[in-house]
């Protein structure tokens, strides 16, 4: 995770964009901590060209108007209002992104709301899945059943959409690969399977080997 810090000017936005680009980040969460001008985030979204999530997240579920009105000081009252002003900027950001052709999503809620954190985790999981697909090497064994058109796959699209490298295998090739595996390699791969996948207990040992 890379923290771009507080961005409050177009100049700092440009510098932050370069830092984020150099870190090769996969997704950008923009936390709207108070009212902000769209000019402070447009340079970032323009330059890094990755999914953008606007976090329209309030500090609490509802503003305590009695507390704010009881402060008796316009400066303090304005400060408290600005601390709850996330939703004021969100339409401005969305308008500019729409006009600029920048794709984005908006997550709305408040900090202690479980839904908000679940959604953030879902976005992170999605990025992990995309990253895994991009570094994936997938083997295809056999051929399609003639006439079963609904299962035919465009492997070229699979490659350029997700970055997956695809190996087309014949059974004789697969057997040769299997015969070349050492006992230590087999044991290590079985351990990796058990750590990364939920293996059905009904699977026979010889099938896993």
Predicted regions and their residues:
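An N-terminal assembly and electron-transfer interface module characteristic of large anaerobic redox
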Residues: 1-209
